[in-house]
Regions:
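Solvent-exposed, non-membrane alpha-helical residues enriched in polar/charged side chains
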Residues: 66, 108, 188, 224-225, ...
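Conserved hydrophobic/aromatic "anchor" residues
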Residues: 11, 207, 329-331
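NAD(P)-dependent short-chain dehydrogenase/reductase
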Residues: 132-161, 185-262, 291-298
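Short aromatic-enriched loop/helix-cap "lid" or pocket-rim segments at secondary-structure transitions
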Residues: 42-44, 67, 130-134, 211-215, ...
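C-terminal substrate-binding subdomain of Rossmann-fold SDR/epimerase-dehydratase oxidoreductases
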Residues: 17-18, 229-360
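Residue-level signal for the nucleotide or nucleotide-sugar donor/cofactor binding architecture
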Residues: 60, 91, 99-102, 167-170, ...
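Activation loop
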Residues: 43, 82, 219-223, 321
Length: 360
């Protein structure tokens, strides 16, 4: 089997390459990356040691994609992954669309040409921001939590277990979310029209050692590294208390599901049979305040500034209910948050220069 991994030099791409090399005997791995993410250059030697043929190319250029050798499967792990992309001054809206949607379109033409299957890594940020902001949560014991007295089934697509795949995707979802949602739709349409398998994985917050974490993407690794180095940290919005909650997932658990998907065929043409949440779930959900408490215990106290001013697209509670993937593949995350935090902390302690790698 030959697998093409896009964004191969990123944290997720490299993690997938490592896991698939171990899981699939004789697999031929090809990677493509434009190496634009700060820190991605450091993974080139890792990929070389894994026997990955890394192509320095850009998915925005159709000619770069057309020049790639034929593969049996494509795992699309390339994206501008920030929910603030297009509005934060780092990239324009057009650049965001070209990266995320244009790149996926070129890959879909590649899959059509070579009859390759596609696994598209998407995001929890495809969901309606007003609907997410209206979820029945309140601050309890240092974190936003689902209100226990909320009637069952009173919220369409969500429960105390998290957000389900049928939650509203009505705009606004952010420019970033719109590019990923459009990519999902195109992928499903291409797969149906041209007869190749498509799986879509809407991922929660991926976290682990070696991640190039930033405040807007990779928050757990970012927070732990900055806490250890006594760099400034801020609780932004929601009163500046740090109560906002996300669930975390180790990339090895994502890789396990991807491996299962590589040897499976979608059961039916309905989108519901091909779109899955891949997240740590309610058991791995932690607030920033809880993460700080963990860091204080590990590294010693470090003051965090309070900034109550709201930031665009910030939400109090995003937890993914991944029971659809569990039902389909008997898949569950095997690494809990404390294990993930410990792994990140050990890596941070061994690599005092990591923040500089991550921030460029």
């Amino acid at each position: 089997m030959r697998i093409l991994i896009t964004g191969a030099a990123g944290f997720v791409g490299t993690s997938l390459a490592h896991a698939l090399r171990s899981a699939i005997a004789g697999v031929d791995l090809i990677g493509i990356d434009n190496l634009s993410r700060a820190g991605s250059e450091t993974n080139r030697s890792t990929l070389r040691a894994l026997g990955v043929r890394l192509v320095h190319g850009d998915l925005r250029l159709a000619s770069d994609v057309e020049a790639l050798p034929a593969a049996d499967w494509v795992i699309d792990a390339a994206a501008n992954p920030s929910v603030l992309a297009g509005i934060d001054g780092r990239s324009s809206p057009r650049q965001l669309v070209e990266h995320n949607l244009g790149g996926t379109l070129h890959l879909l033409d590649y899959c059509r040409q070579h009859r390759a299957g596609l696994i598209l890594l998407s995001t929890s940020r495809v969901y309606s921001i007003p609907a997410l902001a209206a979820l029945p949560v309140s601050a309890q014991d240092g974190a936003f939590r689902w209100n226990a007295n909320t009637p069952a089934a009173s919220v369409v697509g969500a429960s105390e277990q998290g957000i389900r795949e049928d939650f509203s995707t009505e705009a606004p979802v952010s420019l970033y979310g719109a590019t990923k949602l459009a990519s999902e739709t195109l992928a499903l349409e291409y797969g149906d029209a041209f007869g190749f398998p498509v799986w879509i994985n809407r991922c929660g917050v991926l976290a682990g050692a070696g991640q190039f974490g930033r405040a807007d993407q990779g928050i757990f690794a970012y927070w732990i590294n900055r806490h250890l180095r006594r760099r400034p940290l801020r609780y932004i919005g929601f009163g500046g208390h740090g109560f906002q909650v996300r669930d975390c997932l180790h990339p090895a658990d994502l890789a396990h599901l991807v491996h299962l998907q590589l040897t499976s065929t979608p059961d039916a043409p309905s989108p519901g049979s091909r779109i899955f949440h891949v997240g740590g779930g309610i058991g791995s959900a932690r607030s920033l305040l809880q993460l700080t408490a963990w860091c204080d215990d590990r590294f010693g106290p470090h003051a965090v500034a309070e900034d109550p001013a709201p930031r665009p697209y910030d939400l109090p509670w995003i937890v993914l209910d991944a029971r659809r993937a569990e039902s389909r593949w008997q898949w569950r995350p095997t690494r809990g948050p404390e294990q993930i935090f410990h792994e990140i902390a050990e890596h941070a302690e061994r690599n005092p220069e990591w923040l500089e790698h991550s921030e460029g």
